[in-house]
Amino acid sequence: MKWGDARRSDNVEDVRGAGGGGFGLRHLGFGGTIAVLGIGWLLGINPLQMLGLMSALDSGAPVPQQGHAPPGNDAQADFVRAIVGETEDVWSALLPAQGVPYSPPTLVLFSGRVQSGCGGASAAMGPFYCPNDQRVYLDMGFFDEMRAQLGGGGDFANAYVIAHEVGHHVQNLLGIEDRVTQARRAGQRMQGGEGLSVRLELQADCFAGVWAYTRSSGITGWKRATWSRR
């Protein structure tokens, strides 16, 4: 995956080294589970292998979570800025065409623990989006764990995770998050294979696919032919 020439986003905040240490439980959150399954499907990885990865990540083993300050020349942060910039370019072109202005989220890089608009969180949760402050939170250690368990994921797999979380921001801008919240309060089923939680995550995967397609094939023709068919 070539990303070196991509525009770097200014909407990345690096607070690594500012969080507290301690120990957490190794647990892959629900959104992270769907994102990892989506990556496996795209890369042609056996679903049983993916389930093995999630079982390992969800083992409940204590994992040390120490905050470390980033190096001065941080290639990982540069990669994240490039991918966030790509998602900004894609969605700032697609959403206004549907009458929805696009305001990009801020992606927060943290290590160990972080305080979000949705409350305190640790790296054990995996990457997540908080609609209250419209921010994506990412501990880069998630990529290391995913790479170690999969035997290699690469830049595309990492970028897909970021695009998936940005997909939740797109849902928020489209009012989908609010509609799901209203449905939950009305007693609609959230859990299970047909539940709204799974559907919400699968749609975020779909939006990540929009990014993946347009970064390689361009926006113009696909935007008119496909995005409008909702």
How should each PLM-predicted stretch be described?
Residues 6-21, 25-230:
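A Zn2+-metalloprotease active-site environment signal
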